[in-house]
A protein has these predicted regions:
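Class I (Rossmann-like) S-adenosyl-L-methionine-dependent methyltransferase catalytic domain
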Residues: 1-85, 92-129, 150-152, 169-238
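Local beta-strand N-terminus motif with an aromatic residue
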Residues: 65, 135-136
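Residue-level marker of regulatory loop/turn positions in helix-turn-helix DNA-binding domains and
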Residues: 132
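A conserved beta-strand element that flanks and buttresses the S-adenosyl-L-methionine
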Residues: 139
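Short catalytic micro-motifs in class I SAM-dependent methyltransferases
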Residues: 142-146
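A short, conserved alpha-helix within the catalytic core of class I
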Residues: 147-159
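Conserved helix-to-beta-strand junction in the class I
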Residues: 159-165
Length: 238
């Protein structure tokens, strides 16, 4: 296990306040997510972005059922939103607890064979041993900001490229770096535990270039939120 992976797992699986960890991981019925409409809204918004992008690309129809992969599914709000649209939904996480919660939640919804958990044990390329079919959709919301380094995020994109095919659509939310000290990336792994909420950020043009360098074609940037420095990148595999 790499030092970066161990530092992240120490927070996202073994944090001393489990209720807080579940809230930050978007578990249904916990903390802020006791409001179920608010919890479901996250997944609905992600799905609306996918549908809008499909129209932007002038593709004839939304591919149903499709194969999706989410990096950092947490408590499964995106999984919940897409449960009737997918034939396979891969959830990649460093937290066994989060993956177990996704399985519990989606089984309770009557789709026990839909979700395939992918537990990372060392590095992002771990997924290549489990994801054996090309994916149609890649999703990652409010996760890249928690990565222990910019380079880790690049490795994630390389792993995703390896399981993509021409036409694979990606939706990734990042925290962008505009010089605000609050959102600067950490420079040493020793900072991670204290600053895991704002550990990683990219300049807008930097992340656009990273997508191109890892084999994707960026399409647009949307949902820029200047209060928390969020930006969502839409891209596809050519």
């Amino acid at each position: 296990m790499s030092e970066q992976h161990a530092a992240a797992q120490d927070v996202w699986e073994r944090y001393e306040d489990e209720e807080w960890r579940q809230d930050q991981s978007h578990w249904r019925g916990v903390g802020r997510w006791k409001d179920d409409k608010r919890w479901q809204a996250i997944g609905k918004h992600t799905l609306s972005k996918l549908r809008a992008t499909w129209r932007l690309l002038d593709r004839p129809h939304f591919p149903e059922p499709f194969v999706a992969l989410e990096w950092g599914p947490g408590g499964g709000t995106n999984l919940f939103a897409m449960q009737r649209l997918c034939r396979t939904y891969y959830g990649v996480d460093i937290s066994p607890s989060n993956l177990a919660e996704c399985e519990r939640m989606i089984t309770q919804e009557g789709h026990s064979n839909l979700f395939t958990p992918v537990l990372l044990t060392a590095q992002p390329s771990d997924i290549l041993a489990i994801v054996k079919e090309p994916i149609d959709v890649f999703i990652s919301t409010a996760v890249f900001q928690h990565f222990p380094s910019k380079e880790y995020g690049i490795e994630v994109l390389r792993a995703i490229k390896a399981v993509s095919k021409p036409g694979t659509l990606g939706v990734v939310q990042i925290r962008y770096d505009n010089g605000n000290e609050k959102f600067r990336s950490i420079t040493d792994l020793s900072e991670y535990r204290e600053r895991h909420i704002t550990a990683n950020s990219y300049q807008i043009d930097e992340f656009w270039k990273i997508l191109r360098d890892t084999g994707f074609s960026p399409l647009m940037i949307r949902d820029i939120n200047a209060q928390v420095n969020y930006a969502t990148f839409i891209f596809h595999c050519t």
